[in-house]
Amino acid sequence: MLFRSQITVFVGNYDFWYESSQLLIRQQKEANKKAEARAKELREFIARFSANAKRAKSATSRKKELEKLEITDIKPSSRKYPFVDFKFERELGADILKVEGLTKKGFFTDLTFTVKPEDKIGFISESGNTLSMLFDILTGKEEADGGSFKWGSTVIPAYMPQNYDEFFDGVDLTLVRWLDQYSRQHDEEYLRSWLGRMLFSKEEALKKAKVLSGGEKVRCMLAKMMLMQGNFLILDEPTNHLDLESITSLNKGLINFKGPLLLVSHDHELVQTTCSRIIDIEGGVKVYDKDISYDEYIDEQSK
């Protein structure tokens, strides 16, 4: 990886890279601090004794040491981070979401669970399609074969499906006009401000929605979710196609989100840092539901 203008190889996952890169920066800063202190000592010695015949040799030696002393210029990172911040105006009531006996043939049977205002739930399953179908049903994209679910009257869900191509394929709109479809305010500068948060500059905001890359589509979907000010987030594999900086920003945004959350993700760190309840659906049946962190859940399963 190109790190601080040098090629540095980090063997491991994203978490290992991030921790290692931050450690390198801290170590370099500490080395610089010591080098600067030593440089100060050398300059003081040289200034004091360079004119002293008896100490001239020592002063010359100090000058050579000072010339060789390296203080690395730690430049600010050039990496750009989107600004992900999910705010909402409508306060939540006590009733959020109640799912009873929900059934979809070929996916799951008799699913029952209740979401409380403080819940941030990580969903686990051997079948990602099962969880995608569940989220699609809860958001009205698909219909269940049996059972029921009921949203609280104060809830405004904001959903990022795993497959969002339908929002972009063949859509001959600029990003400004694309986002305008989901906004109550239609001022162009207002819309551009939301796109700017997701690193779409003035020119990039005029791109056509149909030509976006996978990562750009995700950033647009995040802009859409923030703009809609949903007080209940549902995200299905939101880190797909995102770069490291965008994943970091999304992670922080979800940690700071004050409403309930339903999340499916293969990103261990994302689930661990944002979710405080785990629901496991295997073979179409709910086999686990507990207020617990992801790491604690993994520890339980390994015993």
Question: What is the predicted role of each segment?
Answer:
Residues 1-30, 89-303:
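ABC ATP-binding cassette signature C-motif
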Residues 20-110:
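Flexible nucleotide-interacting loop at or near the entrance of a catalytic core
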